């Protein structure tokens, strides 16, 4: 609605998260015609690969898969948030395919990240975003979510006992 009512607003979206096409660097923009015209004139001639375009088109046609991924993410994001909150961790509210888990300090976040990596789980330490005490954890499949909860439960138990 805002894009339709203003001549200087652009809305962009990516196919990275819900469609799982992050590596293809495909997205779209909704904007007034004069802005789209300008973007067409300044963009590179082949700014989206043929494979990326084909994948994006296929993803748009398969809305049932998108709905399945959305529902899975909502369910397991809520589950993981509840599990980690019960461990005393602070989880920022999220509507994305990841949660931001805040630890007591940067050192505890680094040690939690190391514990998860030992279990084969890779998170993103977000110190470079000004959040040294936080980890960004993507909502994966059920097994991955349960593993994150398991390894962080073990880590926090050890931490509280002075062993982590």
Where are these regions (language model features)?
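Conserved core of the PLP fold type I
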Residues: 1-5
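Short acidic/glycine-enriched loop/turn segments that link adjacent beta-strands
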Residues: 23, 95, 130-133
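Thr-Gly-centered strand-to-loop micro-motif
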Residues: 13-14, 101-102, 123-126
């Amino acid at each position: 609605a805002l894009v339709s009512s203003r001549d200087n607003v652009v809305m962009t979206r990516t196919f990275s998260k819900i469609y799982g096409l992050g590596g293809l660097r495909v997205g779209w923009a909704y904007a007034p015609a004069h802005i789209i015209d300008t973007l067409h004139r300044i963009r590179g001639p082949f700014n989206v690969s043929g494979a990326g375009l084909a994948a994006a088109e296929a993803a748009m046609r398969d809305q049932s898969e998108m709905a399945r991924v959305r529902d899975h993410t909502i369910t397991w994001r809520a589950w993981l948030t509840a599990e980690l909150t019960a461990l005393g961790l602070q989880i920022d509210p999220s509507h994305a395919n990841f949660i931001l888990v805040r630890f007591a300090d940067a050192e505890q976040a680094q040690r939690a990240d190391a514990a998860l990596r030992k279990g084969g789980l890779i998170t993103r330490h977000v110190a470079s975003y000004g959040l040294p005490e936080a980890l960004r954890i993507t909502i994966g499949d059920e097994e991955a979510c349960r593993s994150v909860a398991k390894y962080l439960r073990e880590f926090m138990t050890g931490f509280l006992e002075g062993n982590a």
